[in-house]
Amino acid sequence: MFKINRILRVFLPLVPLGFALAALPACHAAPATPDAEALLKRSDAFRNGWPSYVVRVKITDYEAGKSDEEHLYQVSQKGTEKTYVDFLSPREKGEHMLMLDDDMWIYLPGTSRPVRITPLERLTGDASNGDVARTNYAADYSPVFVRTEKAAGADCYVLQLTARRKGATYQRILYWLRVPDARPVRAEFYLTSGKFIKSATFDEYEMSAGRMVLHKLTLYDEIRHSSHSVLEYSGAAPHNLPDRLFYQGNTNMF
């Protein structure tokens, strides 16, 4: 009897502790942080569907809600370092733009040599040269995962991109990618000073040559708030582009 009482004195005080532990919520491991580099590369596939390809880009500029100008370009891109842009609108006929690595030039009819330009310079409306000719973000920016939140009704990963090469168009980008497939949804663009200058919505996608690619992008001026430009992409398809197309000294081609 003495032995039983002794056991009870030891065991009974532990009973409430056992119930308390059982009532605690189950512990779960913290979710793994998404791989920002992998997400950025996946997102680039929606804008650059093939290693070597051609796409037409129509840009319509709006001022105070009214259509102002319209421009047409043919963009030929090979890898992440070479882009050739042919200006197709009648009043710009004969103009061309070339990107090689971190350098860009524009050729204007009547001039003897190409003029060096920067990706950030205005092409038309709210579109910069780099918005058309430099769209491989994984090559130009270092990404960091920031958070997960909803944008345009979809769960999105938010990445912060910081320029890692001098040819990058912007110093910093906040980039919203849809959780299931890393499809771009929204972006905010910042200068080196930290100034927020432009935003973008990735509005429509379509199947082209067997790939889901970007069809419509809208760029908004975040300084004046009175203008925006709509970029519509069509005919995107893989092409075996010759290296001579990207030769800066070839004035017949450039």
Kindly label every feature range from the protein language model:
Residues A30-S52, K58-I59, S67-E69, K93, ...:
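Flexible, processing/modification-adjacent segments and terminal tails
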Residues N136, A154-G249:
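Gly/Pro-enriched, hydrophobic low-complexity segments
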Residues R56, V75, F87, R91, ...:
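Ribonuclease/tRNase effector modules and their secretory precursors
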Residues V54-Y84, L88-P90:
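N-terminal, post-signal-peptide region of Sec/Tat-exported proteins
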Residues S43, Y73-Q77, F202-M207:
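Extended lipid/amphipathic-ligand handling interfaces
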Residues V10-A23:
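Bacterial N-terminal signal peptides
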Residues M1-L8:
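N-terminal secretory signal peptides that target proteins for export/translocation
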